[in-house]
Amino acid sequence: MKETVVALSLLATAAAAQAQSSVTLYGRIDNGIQFESGIPGGHAWSAASGNFGCSWWGLEGSEDLGGGTKAIFQLESQLNTMNGQLEGNLFGRHATIGFTNPSYGTFKMGNIGAGEISQDSWGTDPQLMQRYGISSLVRGRNWASAANAFEYQTPTWGGLYFRGQYALTNNTSWNTATTPTGQGRTNGIEGVYAFGMGDFRVIYDEVRGADGTFDDVYNHSRSLLAGGTLVFGPVHFYAGYQHLNAPNATDASVGVTPGSQPVGVSAPTSVDHEWFGAAWQVSTATAVTAAVYHANANHGNGNATLYTLGATYNLSKRTFLYTEAGYIHNSSTSNLALYDSAYGNNNFNPVTNTASNGNPNYGHSQEGIFAGVMHQF
């Protein structure tokens, strides 16, 4: 009889826990093909994963703690679904736990990863997270990450909310390796206001180098971004501006050697980046996107303009086809690439057919097009 009572009690406890908790498995798979010219060595066809957006899978869940408060968690992993390999650590995109309440907001801590506040910049770009877009002319600066982090987001008041982050990473006196490596401390704040015809956001964030300085404008810098959208029927218009600043940047800190760049060119400490575009929902299934981006860097690094045109076609609620074409024009001392390639000369070796990065030669252009399919679950 005691065994029966104990068993019934355990079942009741499990049922109650199940009623108060939820766990969701989610993810998406993005595979396709691409062609690009103007790259070191000429041109290339290649299979590609993540050209519209990264492939990932994850788990997220919550437990009702009463009084409107819930405990929440998220674990998320990025994959290259062309070869099945992990991109980085197992849960490099997200590994967080926290609490949420509709009256007090949301707090979480852990590996914020791809939730670093600068990544919200995609909300100001009609190309969203595609290969050719808002990250191209800032060499990936908008895709920063944050570990050992804390985040708080306010409730939404009449369409307005704020979000702040502070990530210790490897650069504080009480959270450091013997020899700091990689990225240092990050912190940022964002304000978003949504209204009837669109939204507007401002994002300020800092990403420091391992020594705590701003020594690389495309990786370890201050960023101020403002942008938004306006909706007129089936057309969404997008526009934005971003300023990057890294006062401690030198040729040595960005990894370039003397004489490897055009005369008069040295590591930039400032970049101005602006863009505008639109997304047109042609039909229930079809959308067309277009955008123009322009960036200018100081210290003789010149400027570049990127033109993009894309389209999507929904096969179902969870599966769609996509394509995007891009063309980038560089001034004589600029060598920005279609995708967020590293700063510096490509150092192409025609004998071994190898290069330091995917940048074109200085003053040269790049063209590319890709297509693929994405499924979400």
Could you tell me what each predicted segment is?
Residues 33-41, 79-83, 115-117, 170-174, ...:
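Gram-negative outer-membrane beta-barrel proteins
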Residues 45-55, 91-93, 144-148, 183-187, ...:
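Residues that define the transmembrane beta-barrel architecture of outer-membrane proteins
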Residues 315, 361-377:
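Outer-membrane beta-barrel "beta-signal"
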Residues 188-313, 324-327, 364:
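Detector for outer-membrane/organellar transmembrane beta-barrel domains
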Residues 21-35, 45-171, 183, 192-196, ...:
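Outer membrane beta-barrel
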Residues 42-46, 136-138, 174-177, 212-214, ...:
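Extracellular loop and loop/strand-boundary signature of outer-membrane beta-barrel proteins
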Residues 14-16:
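N-terminal signal peptide c-region/cleavage motif recognized by signal peptidases
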Residues 60-64, 100-102, 153-156, 192-196, ...:
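Structural signature of outer-membrane beta-barrel channels/translocons
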